[in-house]
A protein has these predicted regions:
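N-terminal FAD cofactor-binding segment of flavoenzymes
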Residues: 46-111
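N-terminal Rossmann-like FAD-binding beta1-loop-alpha1 element of flavoenzymes
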Residues: 1-9, 15, 19-51
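FAD-binding beta-loop-beta segment adjacent to the flavin cofactor pocket
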Residues: 330-361, 495-509, 518-536, 543
Length: 593
């Protein structure tokens, strides 16, 4: 049993004796694990309580993805669901746009493109027959409703800020952040104490580079335990446009286009990894975005500005004519693949979804693998808890104090024999091949897809962190990006408004310079790398300013702009920023992402 505390601003505190069989730090895989667990419990007439925390203001508010959705795992969980009845908030089917046309282009310059690469020459994993163009956030909202119907408790606007451990160092749950604390660290009139949630098992589905997940990976040595390479990431920047069908005859629902080449790869041995996507979703939306591997070398490169100039290419702009940008956002994604997956279990909890790193970077998809990992997690946890009838939560939903948190080792075993690992094994060396250059990487990916098929007896390694790949500014010239025209391209602060980002101003900063780094780290960043944080952040959080009467620049952190992409915790020189959760409900308010 534990005490679940609410502290209210008017000074009263109430304690409740609630325990949970199963708890989550929220991410895309959350709902599928929660639903599967409740399905198993109800089928066996067990009363088990499941709790989910969502740091966004509502379910789906912090979800951002391409998204061409592969329904394989969704169909496993809902074999009898008619997809036309999976509805968004406006009563439209989330799955109303099946992929009808697949196109892959190599852009040779800002004006030209080579002929489309024939599908027969592309890896089968890039084919999208049977997939759907969707809003992943809308699907999450539907999934949240399904979970609540089954009795899952979802607390939106609560940010998991701390992992809780028992006397044996096993995870016993999480704590949420106190709210109503001012910048000065003192409680305001709106102060509410954070709450502790204790659970028999806690599943961490925080998405790529989750703060609690990263703590657990380090604390339990999960990378070392699995001989995993350092994770490598990409930054995805996305917009949603709505076009006037009377003014744009190029719109075709179900049209899918990916590009490589210009503007990132300007010569055959370019080591900058990345490309673009552009999807047409009924009735009139164009979903488009740009992904840049964060292992790039040039500190002057700006993923956001590369995205903006890419939109001016004729093979892109023709789909935006007569339209308007209605939403903007950004998020990092895992690109390390199979080699970078840590050990998945530890006493009292597990990692699932992109917290573990199951994204397939060749497919440019991770939602289907996140769903599958959630299903496998629920099955493994339920099976373990079922071994001892007395270990189930009792009639008062109290946790048996004598029953210590378990490590669900079967989850690791079951994932390794699942189709997720089979899929990732087939492309395990493809991303690392691009470290030798763009053309060698493309050639290797082709051979791996059509000949080797994952059976190569060697491993191409990613030996270092993305932050270590940045080279000194002296090796490069500053990039002269074109000015945004306000039609196809936009300045960053204008676009940021389309993300709906909001944080309470009077709260402690959630982006903090690590004490062991101090000002020395950012001073070295500006002196050696010319301040790359000014360029890679897709929200204008970091800038170097000169105060009146001063001659030297200083770092200014505009934490209120943060879209929670996590890029700074990855690419910052010396990784000197500690990304922590702000007050729950803050951050972007994505509706269509």
């Amino acid at each position: 049993m534990f005490m679940f505390w609410f502290a209210f601003g008017f000074g009263f505190a109430f304690g409740f004796a609630f325990g949970f069989a199963f708890g989550f730090a929220f991410g895309f895989g959350f709902a599928f694990a929660a639903i599967k667990f409740k399905q198993l419990a109800l089928a066996n007439e067990k009363e088990l309580s499941v709790c989910v925390l969502e740091k966004g203001a509502e379910v789906g508010a912090h979800i951002l993805s391409g998204n061409v959705f592969e329904p394989r795992a969704f169909d496993e969980l809902f074999p009898d669901v008619d997809k036309s009845e999976v509805l968004d908030g406006e009563g439209n089917s989330v799955f109303n746009t099946p992929v009808e046309e697949d196109k892959f282009l190599f852009l040779t310059s800002e004006e030209k493109a080579a002929p489309a690469i024939p599908n027969a020459l592309l890896p089968s994993q890039l084919h999208n027959e049977g997939n759907y163009v969707i809003s992943l956030g809308q699907l999450c909202r539907w999934m949240g409703a399904q979970a609540e119907e089954l009795g899952v408790e979802i607390y939106a606007g609560f940010a998991a800020s701390e992992v809780l451990y028992d006397e044996s160092n096993a995870v016993k749950g999480i704590a949420t952040r106190d709210v109503g604390i001012g910048k000065d660290g003192k409680p305001k009139d709106t102060f509410e104490r954070g709450i502790e949630l204790h659970a028999r098992q806690t599943v961490f589905c925080e998405g790529a580079r989750g703060s609690c997940s990263e703590e657990l990976i380090k604390k339990f040595g999960l990378r070392e335990a699995n001989s995993a390479q350092p994770q490598t990431y990409g930054l995805g920047v996305k917009e949603v446009w709505e076009v006037d069908l009377e003014k744009n005859e190029n719109f075709r629902p179900g049209f899918v286009q990916h590009t490589i080449g210009w503007p990132l790869q300007d010569h055959p041995l370019s080591k900058t990894f990345g490309g673009s996507f552009l999807y047409h979703q009924a009735p009139n939306r164009v979903l488009l975005g740009f992904v840049v591997g964060l292992d790039y070398e040039n500190p002057y490169l700006s993923p956001y500005k590369e995205f903006q100039r890419w939109k001016h290419h004729p093979e892109v702009s023709k789909y935006l004519e007569g339209g308007a940008c209605v939403s903007y956002g950004a998020r990092v994604l895992n690109e390390g693949g199979l080699h970078s997956i840590p050990k998945l279990t530890f006493p009292g909890g597990i990692l699932a979804g992109c917290s573990a790193g199951f994204l397939n970077s060749v497919k440019i998809k991770g939602s289907h693998t996140a769903i599958k990992s959630g299903i496998v997690a629920a099955e493994a946890i339920y099976e373990e808890l079922s071994k001892d009838e007395e270990s189930f939560v009792g009639v008062n939903f109290e946790i048996n104090a004598e029953d210590k948190p378990k490590e669900i080792v079967s989850y690791q075993e079951n994932m390794e024999t699942s189709w997720v690992y089979e899929e990732l094994k087939a492309v395990r060396n493809c991303h690392a091949a691009f470290h030798y250059g763009f053309l060698p990487g493309m050639m290797y990916a082709g051979v791996a897809a059509h000949v080797l098929r994952g059976n190569e007896p060697w491993t191409l390694s990613n030996a270092s962190e993305d932050s270590d790949k940045t080279k000194p500014a002296s090796a490069f010239q500053e990039i002269n990006y074109p000015k945004p025209d306000g039609v196809f391209s936009f300045d960053l602060l204008t676009n940021l408004q389309r993300s709906g980002t909001y944080h309470t101003d009077d709260q402690p900063a959630h982006l903090r310079i690590k004490p062991e780094c101090g000002s020395k780290a950012w001073k070295d960043s500006i002196a050696t790398y010319d301040g790359p944080e000014q360029n890679f952040c897709p929200a204008g959080v970091y800038e170097y300013v000169i105060d009146d009467g001063e001659t030297e620049k200083r770092l200014q952190i505009n934490a209120q702009n943060c879209v929670h992409c996590k890029c700074c915790s990855i690419k910052m020189p010396h990784q000197y920023i500690n990304w922590t959760v702000p007050e729950g409900g803050g951050g972007p308010q994505y509706q269509l992402m």
